[in-house]
Amino acid sequence: MTQAVMLQGTASDVGKSVLVAGLCRIFYQDGLRTAPFKSQNMALNSGITPDGKEMGRAQIFQAEAAGIAPDVRMNPVLLKPTSDRKAQVVLMGKVATDMDAVSYHEYKPRLREQILTVYNSLAQEYDVLVLEGAGSPAEINLRDRDIVNMGMAEMAQCPVILVADIDRGGVFASIYGTLALLHDSERARVKGVIINKFRGDVTLLYSGIEQIEALTGVPVLGVMPWLEVDLEDEDGVALQKGKYLRTDKRDIDIAVVQVPHISNFTDFNALAAQPDVRVRYVRHPEELAGADLIILPGSKNTLGDLVWLRESAMAHGVLQAHRQGVPVAGICGGYQMLGDTIIDEVESGLGTLPGLGLLNTVTHFAQDKTTTQVEGQMASALPGWLAAASGLAVRGYEIHMGETTLNAQCQPAMTLRKGENAIADGAVTDDGLVFGTYLHGLFDSDAFTRALVNGLRVRKGLTPLDHAFHYAQYKSQQFDLLADAMRQHIDIEKIYTIMQQHREPV
């Protein structure tokens, strides 16, 4: 009989995703077959399963914490905002349609049966399912059609643990207010509270914990300290709050342009984990000063972000830096923006726009989205500072709705294996100062990333490092650190008891 527990939050960005990953790691360490589940995820950070399905990055890294391959059933509904009012709806890993918020709210009840079927199929295969809610269960205006918080807990018949963020202040009010706004049947599902992101002397909380337990009748299962573990973030909230704003000095400085619709900024986690690299996310042209490499990231609204580049003067800043000899790279949408022309009759309604003109390429948007995991190797004779990366193996995934054609003065950056075919991907200029690719996750390829960083070191007159950095091993260590901290600060045995007392046949 499958056991399950669901983490819901008093608000967005309280740390649910990380704590779910931690529980997945703990149960995995304890020998239980464990899988994460989030019925509906809204995020621009997505990834691709081994069978070519698109799902949220949060559930992918939670699956990694559980020691299993990601499966689209772990995130059957993915919403990818394309503007402030509309989102692309991805169902079971494939694009279904675009909807505005009102239309989607009306549509949600039709998804309940499919979500429950998917959940039950996972429950047949795993000992424990760790569910994650979205935002807060106290969104009373959305309650009647909820499929991700208490609505999902009811479908799964599972207990709920409420996560509250003390770092933002008002933690006891947020706990009390959330519980007060729940219906009696919903409140009865909440079996514990975790206070997250605490800094300071925990004894100062004890009297408050006693009072909130008396007021609500719900026990506090633990107080998690603020942790310096390096794990992925689900969406752009962390960027907006400056989590990735690093001030420490490193040998190599990489500036990632933070376009308004940035997607898959997790591409750069492996770069930031390098011992000699500082990755900065920048929004103003003056912040490009001192960069050894400028990267244009992926985007869910490529032409909209291209317009922003020009209106914000960031385009001028990138072009000026390039004229001064600073290398420029682009990933997916960023690669498209580096070209001469983008022809879009699908995504934005903006038609045809000139790109930055740093690559002699033309991109045509298409209706069909490419979603696949791929492996390949860099071109055999890369020019300039990229030479050390020539011929190296790379792997990653593609998520894009465009095809890019290369013209004169640039060559393919790599060759990717797709089934029996070898397909050229990306582009690099003859001098090597500009390159782009559709390959997300490129920097997770350890040898390539070290060669790229060493190329930047040589340009600065620094000695290359022989440091062998293994990003997959590093991530595994971070999961273990998280699990250790949770075992120390949370009553994990109580969580086991909660699951055992409330497990129900699927």
From Swiss-Prot:
Residues 251-448 form the GATase cobBQ-type domain. One of its GO terms (molecular function) is catalytic activity. Transmembrane segments: none annotated. Keywords: Cobalamin biosynthesis, Glutamine amidotransferase. Gene3D superfamilies: 3.40.50.880, P-loop containing nucleotide triphosphate hydrolases (3.40.50.300). The active site is at residues 332, 440. One of its GO terms (biological process) is cobalamin biosynthetic process. It comes from the Bacteria. It holds the Pfam family GATase_3. Pathway: Cofactor biosynthesis; adenosylcobalamin biosynthesis. Catalyzes amidations at positions B, D, E, and G on adenosylcobyrinic A,C-diamide. NH(2) groups are provided by glutamine, and one molecule of ATP is hydrogenolyzed for each amidation. Belongs to the CobB/CobQ family. CobQ subfamily. This is Cobyric acid synthase.
